[in-house]
A protein has these predicted regions:
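Conserved short beta-strand elements that form part of the metal-binding/catalytic scaffold
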Residues: 514-548, 597-603
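N-terminal beta-strand motif that seeds the catalytic metal site of vicinal oxygen chelate
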Residues: 480-502, 552-554, 604-605
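Vicinal oxygen chelate
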Residues: 481-486, 565-605
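Short acidic/glycine-enriched loop/turn segments that link adjacent beta-strands
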Residues: 519, 550, 582-586
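Short secondary-structure junctions
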Residues: 423-427, 512-518, 574-579
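Structured, active/binding-site neighborhoods that engage oxygen-rich ligands
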Residues: 1-481
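Amphipathic alpha-helical segments
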Residues: 499-514
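Short amphipathic alpha-helices within nucleic acid-binding modules
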Residues: 503-506, 562-567
């Protein structure tokens, strides 16, 4: 290992350091997210291949046991770590009102587009959405909150350090870090870990000249009195300390001091690991820190120590550092890699990231956010929040608007930003009753947001073919509605069958239909396409247990899906499955007046 710093830190501007920290965190997040066990990756690609090739597309299982479905994550896309860094950064643009904007706007809105969010942060954000302080909620919620000691705080506080990069004192930054942290986490492990990490990032932003080997760890250890105190938050959230005492008695400050001692012990282990020089001891040190221990690996203190260690260890070879973090299988890889990337970027700027700096999701937007924070004159000290507190009704209105929208439609997102619908994703369901759809929205500022809706499919809605589905088609409508001309290129009826072998024999041998095409999962006989009920299990059902999966679907291939969609909407026919893209085809499904499913398809390449 090369222990010399290969970068001349004197030549790196503060803006470049800020952009490097933001992008380094995002790149580490995107590299590490597929590797963490909690991501529930199901495509089982080879990790070594990914490590050498950089970003790759992957598939995760989402929805838990009740709404299971698969979700495709595109190469370079980031998770909640980067989302929450950006939430913090946007809040800081509101000057002294940043904390109120964070709890009233950013956290409640985040509940609608979060990807991979941690339990404590999601619970707290839902409480803010309901207008409740997590530390003032019902007893059960309050206890959960004060037991939350994970890394969800440390992962998002880097913007505070960048905004205060030229400050000569860490005190105000420390206060803001804890004020940010208590919005979601109440245990000292979350807050002390965030303070130690924040101090390391602050040191990295301020560092110029030659960086000594292991210097960052040494500074965090030697300056413990500058970052380890529990700040007074009375002027920000006056009820917090009272709740902390109510739940923990007078012991909260004792727990805090024990946690500081724990943090120092972890950092001492890191310092010891640095003494091994060129020897490859990363796995050994990360193991000693607890990074692979299921019960503590997500702790704020453990993650802070791991990221400070890896950033110190690889200061001379920074990209190797986030790869080491991102592919430490069994650890909380996305957060460790993101936090490691934040420190390394604060030291070395952007250059070390290579093409990853351009290929990570929303790269230009991320750079712009760092640039905005660096231009302090653009911050309005008492800027009024863009809108009042976000409530559930705001988010419900957003969903209603999305369900009515078409690709390309523009409207205001819940946080006041203008967004455009850029894609509609129909997720692969892993159960017969789960329907999962996501809208990809692109904000005018450049951020990509995925908003998902999960629902239950009601078989009775389709199975009752004897009941006409209500469509607003009066005699006048039929006679006078002007509809666009539809050019049909092909047509078939899709039959879901219980036994492919028997059905093929019947249609091919008994009825004489020629098999024109076939694959592992379907057989096309003329204009009839046979599809198995369950291509994996090939389950068989009695006639008494038929479900909606047994219905036939009329498939019509057209030149322009948009024309047909417009006609269907104009006459008020029901859209059963919204427009989605799969394997080069665009398609949606509507219902005819008698409840028959009609799938409209357009080949797009």
């Amino acid at each position: 290992m090369n222990n010399d710093n290969r970068y001349n830190l004197n030549r790196i501007s503060l803006i470049a350091k800020g952009q490097g920290a933001f992008l380094g965190a995002a790149v580490g997040d995107a590299l590490g997210w597929p590797q963490e066990p909690e991501a529930k990756r199901v495509d089982n690609k080879n990790a070594a291949t990914e490590s050498s090739n950089g970003f790759q597309q992957w598939v995760r299982k989402s929805g838990g046991q009740y709404y299971p479905h698969e979700e495709v994550i595109l190469a370079g896309e980031y998770s909640d770590d980067t989302q929450l860094i950006l939430c913090t950064a946007r809040s800081l643009l509101h000057g002294e009102k940043w904390w109120h904007y964070f709890i009233k706007n950013e956290l409640p809105t985040w509940t609608r587009y979060e990807r991979g969010g941690g339990g404590a942060t999601k619970r707290a954000a839902q409480l803010w959405l309901a207008g409740q302080e997590p530390w003032s909620s019902i007893e059960k919620n309050k206890k959960q909150y004060f037991n939350a000691g994970g890394n969800g705080v440390a992962m998002r506080i880097m913007p505070h350090c960048f905004l205060g990069a030229t400050d000569t004192n860490f005190g105000n930054i420390a206060k803001n870090i804890v004020a940010n942290g208590v919005c979601t986490h109440g245990h000292p492990r979350a807050l002390v870990g965030a303070l130690a990490y924040g101090f390391a990032v602050w040191v990295a932003f301020q560092k110029t000249g030659t960086l000594k080997y292991g210097e960052i760890i040494e500074q965090v250890l030697s300056a413990v009195n500058l970052w380890s105190k529990l700040p007074n938050l009375e002027n920000i959230c006056p009820s917090w300390r009272r709740s902390a005492i109510e739940v923990n008695g007078e012991k909260y400050e004792d727990i805090w001091q024990k946690t500081v001692t724990e943090m120092l012990e972890l950092l001492a282990q890191c310092q010891e690991g640095m003494k091994h020089g060129a020897l490859s001891v990363e796995k050994e040190i990360l193991t000693k820190l607890g990074c692979f221990n299921q019960s503590i690996k997500g702790s704020g203190t453990v993650t802070a120590a791991a990221s400070i260690f890896l950033a110190s260890r690889y200061a001379a070879d920074p990209f190797h550092g986030i790869v080491e973090a991102g592919f430490a299988r069994g650890a909380d890889t996305d957060t460790v890699a993101s936090m490691t990337g934040g420190i390394l970027g604060a030291l070395a700027g952007i250059e070390w990231l290579g093409n990853h700096a351009e290929q990570v999701q929303d790269a230009r937007y991320i750079m712009n956010m760092a640039e905005l924070l660096s231009s302090k004159e653009t911050l309005v000290k008492d800027k009024i929040c863009a809108r009042t507190k976000i409530t559930k009704s705001h988010l419900d209105s957003l969903m209603a608007q999305l369900e009515m929208s078409k690709l390309g439609d523009k409207f205001l997102f819940s946080d006041g930003r203008e967004v455009q619908t850029s894609a509609l994703l129909n997720h692969q369901s892993l159960s017969k009753t789960t329907v999962a759809v996501s809208w990809k929205l692109t904000a005018t500022d450049g951020q990509s947001l995925y908003v998902k809706k999960i629902s239950r499919f009601n078989p009775e809605k389709i199975i009752k073919t004897n009941e006409a589905i209500h469509i607003n088609l009066s005699t006048k409508t039929i006679g006078e509605t002007e509809l666009q001309k539809v050019n049909v290129t092909n047509m078939a009826v899709k039959l879901r069958v219980r036994d492919m072998e028997k059905s093929r024999f019947f249609y091919e041998r008994v009825l004489g239909l020629r098999v024109e095409k076939e694959s592992n999962y379907w057989v096309k006989c003329g204009n009839i396409v046979l599809v198995p009920l369950d291509p994996v299990k090939k389950q068989r059902f009695s006639s008494e247990s038929l479900t909606s999966d047994m219905i036939q679907t009329i498939c019509i291939e057209v030149e322009s899906l948009e024309v047909v969609y417009s006609n269907v909407c104009q006459v008020g026919a029901e859209i059963f499955k919204p427009t989605s893209e799969k394997q080069g085809w665009l398609h949606f499904t509507c219902l005819d007046p008698d409840g028959n499913a009609v799938e409209i398809d357009q080949l797009i390449f």
